[in-house]
Amino acid sequence: MSNLSNLRHKLQNGLIASCQPVPGSAMDTPEIVAAMACAALAGGAVGLRIEGISNIQAVRRATDAPIIGIIKRDLPDSEVRITPWLEDIDALSAAGADIIAFDVTCRERPVSVADLYQRARATGCLTMADASNIDDGLLAHHLGIDFIGTTLSGYTQAIVPTEPDLALVTQLAQAGCRVIAEGRYHSPALAAAAISAGAYAVTVGSAITRIEHICGWFCDAIKQCETEKLTEY
C-alpha cells in the first residue's frame, strides 16, 4: 500500500477534528491548537483539520496524524476564503499538511480550481474540495480531487441552515466521491448519520473545539426553558 493510499485508509469511517478556535479568543494560539489536536486524537479522532501556517507547524511537531491544512483569507474582490492562492498551497505543504483543502465553489476567484488542484497535486499532498453543492462536488471529483467535502453547503447563502446537509452527502457518495461530511455536525448522532448516508469520514469542529459556541448552546437552551416557565404563569 502506497503512503497516499495508507493515508486515505486511515481516514475511512473516522472522525476528523477541526481544531479552529474562535479568532482572537483565549484559545487562539498555536500551542493551544496543538493541545486541542492531541486531545482529539486521544479521544479517537483519526485526522485533524487545521487552519493557518503557525498552527499547522505546531500540530505537526506534536503528532504525525493526518492533517488537512487550510488558510483562510478575507479578500476584497472575492468571497472565496479557503486557500484561495497558489502561494497558500506551497505554504501548507511546507508547513506539514498531508491534505490540502480549498474552496471549489463557482464564485469569482483569484485562481481557478483546476490550477489550485494541479499545484496541490505537484506538492505530493492529497487534495480536498470544499464544496457547497452537487455541481461543485462533481466538478471537483471529475478533476481528480481526492476528497469532496460538504464544508460550504449552506454557507454561500444569506441564511445558514441549522442542520447538516445529509442529502448532499448521499448524492456525492452515490456519484462515487470520497465524501468528507462537514458543516453543522453538532452531535454524535448526526456524525453517525453522515456515515450511514455514505460519508467516507466526518469532520466535526465547533461541537468539539469551540468552547464559546458550546457554552452558548447550553445557555440558549437554559434561557429558552426559563422563558417557557415564565409563560406558564
UniProtKB/Swiss-Prot annotation:
**Can you tell which superkingdom this protein's organism belongs to?**
Bacteria
Q: Which UniProt keywords apply?
A: Carbohydrate metabolism, Isomerase
Pfam families for this protein = NanE
Entry's Gene Ontology cellular component terms: cytosol
Report the catalytic activity: an N-acyl-D-glucosamine 6-phosphate = an N-acyl-D-mannosamine 6-phosphate
Pathway entry: Amino-sugar metabolism; N-acetylneuraminate degradation; D-fructose 6-phosphate from N-acetylneuraminate: step 3/5
Q: Name one GO biological process term.
A: carbohydrate metabolic process
Q: Does the keyword Nucleus apply?
A: no
Q: Name one GO molecular function term.
A: N-acylglucosamine-6-phosphate 2-epimerase activity
Fetch the InterPro entries from UniProt: Aldolase_TIM, NanE, RibuloseP-bd_barrel
The EC number(s) this enzyme carries: 5.1.3.9
Function, as annotated, reads: Converts N-acetylmannosamine-6-phosphate (ManNAc-6-P) to N-acetylglucosamine-6-phosphate (GlcNAc-6-P).
Name the NCBIfam families for this protein. Answer: PRK01130.1
Query: HAMAP family recorded for this chain?
Result: ManNAc6P_epimer
Family membership, please give it: Belongs to the NanE family.
What's the protein name?
Putative N-acetylmannosamine-6-phosphate 2-epimerase
